[in-house]
Design a protein with these regions (language model features):
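Membrane-interface helix-loop junctions in multi-pass transporters/channels
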Residues: 1-123
């Protein structure tokens, strides 16, 4: 049953990421991968919130499987972040490479920590 939940959550997470990219990409003027940054930061915030709530006993641990591993695992994307960074390097867009590297990791980590802290405060 857990595997089915992860699969369903993953499908929904991938569709959500596709939708977010469809909203952001047409409005973008620079080569900076803004949609990937948005999904990674918001997904990290949501995962921090989920883990904080689950470890405090406010949501069932089973939610971590379908929502955390499934939905948020598919919604966020380290592989796309890596691919887009390499593509920026190949294009010689060094300014955007450094912005991408400098923002993605720290903002995602901070968002996860904020989500966890926020969830712990709810308990």
């Amino acid at each position: 049953m857990t595997a089915l939940g992860i699969a369903l959550g993953g499908g929904l997470g991938a569709l959500a990421r596709y939708h977010v990219e469809g909203l952001i990409a047409p409005r973008q003027r620079s080569p900076f991968p803004m949609s990937t940054l948005v999904v990674n930061v918001t997904g990290s915030l949501a995962l921090g919130l989920l883990v904080g709530l689950a470890t405090a006993g406010h949501v069932p641990m089973s939610w971590q499987a379908w929502a955390g591993t499934g939905f948020l695992g598919a919604f966020t994307t380290f592989s796309t972040f890596t691919y887009e960074t390499v593509r920026l390097i190949e294009d010689g867009s060094w300014r955007w490479v450094w912005w991408n590297l400098g923002l993605s990791g720290p903002l995602s980590f901070a968002a996860a920590a904020l989500g966890w802290w926020w969830a712990r405060g709810l308990g």
